[in-house]
């Protein structure tokens, strides 16, 4: 390490503090410190603590989390047990920071018993298991609904389309799969083993959690956690304040070495000087986090590590490992720092001196009291006089004294009920010691027999004493009481852990798997970071959001599927194909399994969401009725899903059903399914078309196809539909599309009709093929294949028994994307056997070509190959793109000859409302206004892209969405926008063109 070439003291002495070198040194040091602080502020996450905290409480939270987070103590509102609530927020963020925060689907985190609204408002990739175990849980859910509604109403654009991710199932019953989990003060109701069983049900490997901790619970009936201002107390049951009066010896035996109790002991947590709601938890569950170390369950062994104990809060982690575990001695200690200065003293608890109890007294107080008692002891004095002397000394050492007008506490105040008995016990102890010392002196100065006995060797003395005691019991010396007990400051647990079930865990293969997965995910994140960096350099004033990035759907062909259900017996054939030596068969079987699991999870999520709403409204699984708070609950959910509604048994709907909407299923106490007009049931947007479970079942019943998959990867407008039309043979082919709109367009192009029997027979959607009877064909032609999951394409081929699939699509346009952010999607991308490119467009005008090239250069990561960098146009239209700013939706020029597209559903709804106000025909706002995603594959003469808001919208930064928007027209394209949107790719490219 380099050393300084000059002496600071000499420098200041010779040149003074105004010297140039001294000034430069001070400036340099100050600059380094300031730079360090700025770097901390930049990398530290801002955490706002609204609770009013005192000076000591503020120091507690800053000492614990001030180095990790940029804490802002705003002191806005008084809250019950404010420090505990503030710590809970920091604990949640701290535990989440232990896991990958990329936002990728495989990094979903579970929260056992947490607050789902906290994660919803912060945009965390977290699923909460929040069961309704009692009235308090239901109260919390109602309050969270209110908070969510209040915040959404203040900023609806930020939460547009975002759904709260939680369920009301107990953690062990929830089916959501994730590698990571947290439990913030949620383990009290589950215990260590309950958490391990919940982790096993979720396929969770690592859990991090927190809980209140006081080692004195191991032997005391009550105590205080001073930092949290919390008093805990053991009670017999949750409904009785009877103390746990078990003797100390029995208590130690039962709490440390035995798991069997004759009654159920609860621990009540009360916050001192706060008349607020307290908490009561099972002592057995709390004790398990102090005493247990490992737990083996269903082929997994789970171990707990106690990481940090600070301010009365213990942070722990539970890690599960598969396979065999050789025997190992695991040791841990529970320390009791609160009793290191105390000694135990036995005092009488009954007049006959049969029952005794142990009290704690300061060692210094007892030592000084006993010293004086021993010096002042006199056999000739009455015991009462000596008792008064001891009480006087004891009082002086444990009471408040006044010195020079200042009151001071001498020692520690003794309980008034124990004060007299402590003095009496010290008197008995003093008398016993004098008697023992007298006997020892007499033994030393004994008679001839005693001297002869003392002269014997030790074995002979022991033998002779035992014989005399056996023959003459009355000569046995009196048994004395042990008054003083040394209190141990810790308890040690030695547990031998071993597990011999299951197969050996191949750690090397697992390491290779994780590394490969991380590389793939890292490339996705690097591309996202590069894109953000480019935006930041172009727009240096743009604020970067702290929210996690959007989940990615990039596939990873080397990894298994996380989130799919365990394979059952009926899938043996498809499951076996995933291990086929033929690579493409294995890939297709794996993709089909993933697609089936994905559709099943969509169905389960729909059922879970509807059941949650049903329960929130007061419904249950037995009766067809709801409670009276319907409007509050449904108004709240309506802000995030405008299709939420109630159908009453009278046939009336709570809200008007949107025109053209027909709900195919509903949910009530009988579950999800078709309902009659005389039933009470609820619906949401997923109830219009609800076929996910059927698609999953059908896909699982099929086998992976062995035919050839060919893909024509062409630019927008390259004539894909024309090519399908030219090669279509009715005798051998069937045309399959990704959605209903594309099917109608192809039917019109081939048969000049969208609903004729012939058109509907030969042109069908992928869902229609899987759900309905259909003839077998030798070849299937697929339009817009990138909108299909690879597993669904394989299922279609298998259902049709096709030996060849010719797929048309643009790999750079909007691809299939998961509707469930919690599902770990890895095999959605089409894997063709043959690929051909088409880089000539016949639709897009000449001026669109350089615009798209510019967009690709700006939006795609450096080094990315794109066919749009060399595409050409055969269109005769040379100039087609224009843009103009508008103030509101009323200035949008709605013309029946134009086709209108938007990026968001909110803008689409605004355009439809405007069209209705202008009394335009239903066919116009039903068929001529679409989102960009809905318009993929559509070709129109005149297109208008409308943006009505300037709030952040990532879709305007994505090349695929901007590409689709800019390549739908043949003659003219007009971009009408409100305000300036930072990062608007289309506006920037039009301005530079």
Curated annotation (Swiss-Prot):
<dbReference type="GO" id="GO:0003723">
    <property type="term" value="F:RNA binding"/>
</dbReference>
<dbReference type="GO" id="GO:0005524">
    <property type="term" value="F:ATP binding"/>
</dbReference>
<keyword id="KW-0347">Helicase</keyword>
<dbReference type="InterPro" id="IPR027417">
    <property type="entry name" value="P-loop_NTPase"/>
</dbReference>
<keyword id="KW-1038">Host endoplasmic reticulum</keyword>
<feature type="region of interest" description="Methyltransferase">
    <location>
        <begin position="51"/>
        <end position="409"/>
    </location>
</feature>
<keyword id="KW-0489">Methyltransferase</keyword>
<feature type="binding site">
    <location>
        <begin position="714"/>
        <end position="721"/>
    </location>
    <ligand>
        <name>ATP</name>
    </ligand>
</feature>
<feature type="region of interest" description="Disordered">
    <location>
        <begin position="545"/>
        <end position="576"/>
    </location>
</feature>
<protein>
    <recommendedName>
        <fullName>Replication protein 1a</fullName>
        <ecNumber>3.6.4.-</ecNumber>
        <ecNumber>2.1.1.-</ecNumber>
    </recommendedName>
</protein>
<dbReference type="Pfam" id="PF12467">
    <property type="entry name" value="CMV_1a"/>
</dbReference>
<feature type="domain" description="(+)RNA virus helicase C-terminal">
    <location>
        <begin position="839"/>
        <end position="993"/>
    </location>
</feature>
<dbReference type="GO" id="GO:0004386">
    <property type="term" value="F:helicase activity"/>
</dbReference>
<dbReference type="InterPro" id="IPR027351">
    <property type="entry name" value="(+)RNA_virus_helicase_core_dom"/>
</dbReference>
<feature type="domain" description="Alphavirus-like MT">
    <location>
        <begin position="72"/>
        <end position="290"/>
    </location>
</feature>
<keyword id="KW-0067">ATP-binding</keyword>
<dbReference type="GO" id="GO:0044167">
    <property type="term" value="C:host cell endoplasmic reticulum membrane"/>
</dbReference>
<keyword id="KW-0378">Hydrolase</keyword>
<dbReference type="Pfam" id="PF12503">
    <property type="entry name" value="CMV_1a_C"/>
</dbReference>
<keyword id="KW-1043">Host membrane</keyword>
<keyword id="KW-0547">Nucleotide-binding</keyword>
<dbReference type="Pfam" id="PF01443">
    <property type="entry name" value="Viral_helicase1"/>
</dbReference>
<keyword id="KW-0808">Transferase</keyword>
<comment type="similarity">
    <text>Belongs to the bromoviridae replication protein 1a family.</text>
</comment>
<dbReference type="Pfam" id="PF01660">
    <property type="entry name" value="Vmethyltransf"/>
</dbReference>
<dbReference type="GO" id="GO:0016817">
    <property type="term" value="F:hydrolase activity, acting on acid anhydrides"/>
</dbReference>
<keyword id="KW-0472">Membrane</keyword>
<dbReference type="GO" id="GO:0008174">
    <property type="term" value="F:mRNA methyltransferase activity"/>
</dbReference>
<dbReference type="GO" id="GO:0016020">
    <property type="term" value="C:membrane"/>
</dbReference>
<comment type="subunit">
    <text>Interacts with RNA-directed RNA polymerase 2a.</text>
</comment>
<dbReference type="GO" id="GO:0016556">
    <property type="term" value="P:mRNA modification"/>
</dbReference>
<dbReference type="GO" id="GO:0032259">
    <property type="term" value="P:methylation"/>
</dbReference>
<comment type="function">
    <text>Involved in the virus replication. Contains a helicase domain and a methyltransferase domain. The methyltransferase domain is probably involved in viral RNA capping. Involved in the formation of ER membrane spherular invaginations in which RNA replication complexes form.</text>
</comment>
<dbReference type="InterPro" id="IPR021002">
    <property type="entry name" value="1a_necrotic_phenotyp-det_dom"/>
</dbReference>
<dbReference type="InterPro" id="IPR022184">
    <property type="entry name" value="CMV_1a_C"/>
</dbReference>
<dbReference type="GO" id="GO:0006396">
    <property type="term" value="P:RNA processing"/>
</dbReference>
<feature type="domain" description="(+)RNA virus helicase ATP-binding">
    <location>
        <begin position="687"/>
        <end position="838"/>
    </location>
</feature>
<dbReference type="InterPro" id="IPR002588">
    <property type="entry name" value="Alphavirus-like_MT_dom"/>
</dbReference>
<feature type="region of interest" description="ATP-dependent helicase">
    <location>
        <begin position="712"/>
        <end position="975"/>
    </location>
</feature>
